Amino acid sequence: MPCATHYYSGHADNWFLQLGAGINSPFFEYSDVNGSKKHHLTAVYDVAFGKWFTPYFATRMNFMGGTLHWDNATYHKMNYVAGSVDFMWDMFNGLGGVNTDRVFSIVPFAGLGAAYAWNMQPAGNIAGGKTRHKSTTWAPDISAGLQLRFRLSRYVDFFAEGRVQFLGDVFNGTAYGVPVDLNISAIGGFTINLSLI
């Protein structure tokens, strides 16, 4: 009987670097002083380093950051960075078979990590000592998303991906209302296949 094809990745094979930028919008407890709800879009920057262990499965260390703006009776803003370990699955290779000449792939992913925010203006409602409210905060980060990957050459891919981050309620410095804070981002950029350089 014919044997199934097995794919192996050496220690130096299939590493990649991703550089991207896009927009994000927080879904916190939000409304302006009149009760109307409006989302603010701000820039987000992204860098990731990872490895494809098989044609189907990869992991990456992903770092993203920027500013977040939202209304909570008054205008709020803060700076943030987030890091996560993402687990990626090439859906086309997994369902349609491996094709090294494929020019388009869909890659769902899920991640675990943490996010840190600082320069929160105005400060939230969480006490930080000496009668002051905290202007920095952090929260665990569970995320999920979908990446569209377009092959430009053996060395470079273009990608566009959307990500939803599920953060603890205290991430925006305000502990009431919805128990989970969300941040939604859309990012585009380039993947450099380091093992081919």
Question: For each of these PLM feature ranges, what is it?
Answer:
Residues 1-50, 119:
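Short glycine/proline- and aromatic-enriched beta-strand/turn motifs that initiate or cap beta-hairpins
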Residues 3-14, 56, 92-106, 152-155, ...:
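Short loop/turn motifs that connect adjacent beta-strands in outer-membrane beta-barrel proteins
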Residues 13, 37-43, 77-83, 102-104, ...:
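Residues that define the transmembrane beta-barrel architecture of outer-membrane proteins
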Residues 19-23, 47-51, 85-91, 110-114, ...:
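Residues on the lipid-exposed face of transmembrane beta-strands in outer-membrane beta-barrel proteins
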Residues 29-37, 63-80, 118-140, 172-178:
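Flexible, solvent-exposed loop segments that connect beta-strands
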Residues 55-126:
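Gram-negative (and chloroplast) outer-membrane scaffold detector with strong preference
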Residues 59-60, 73-74, 78-80, 151-197:
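Predominantly the C-terminal beta-signal and adjacent terminal strand-loop region
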Residues 100-102, 107-157, 162-163:
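Extended, charged alpha-helical interaction scaffolds
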